[in-house]
């Protein structure tokens, strides 16, 4: 569903931010 896609994108964003901080 739509919510699953939204959560998926949020996880990608968070992962990208975490990688940038390292």
Curated annotation (Swiss-Prot):
Entry keyword set: Amidation, Amphibian defense peptide, Antibiotic, Antimicrobial, Secreted
Location of the protein in the cell: Secreted
Keyword Secreted set for record: yes
Free-text tissue specificity from the UniProt record: Expressed by the skin dorsal glands.
Any GO CC annotation of this UniProt entry: extracellular region
Tagged with keyword Ligase: no
UniProt superkingdom: Eukaryota
GO BP: any one term: defense response to bacterium
Main location: secreted
Family: Belongs to the frog skin active peptide (FSAP) family. Caerin subfamily.
Primary role: Shows significant activity against Gram-positive organisms, but is less effective against Gram-negative organisms.
Protein name: Caerin-3.5
Organism taxonomic ancestry: Eukaryota, Metazoa, Chordata, Craniata, Vertebrata
């Amino acid at each position: 569903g739509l919510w699953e896609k939204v959560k998926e994108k949020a996880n990608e964003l968070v992962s990208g931010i975490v990688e940038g901080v390292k």
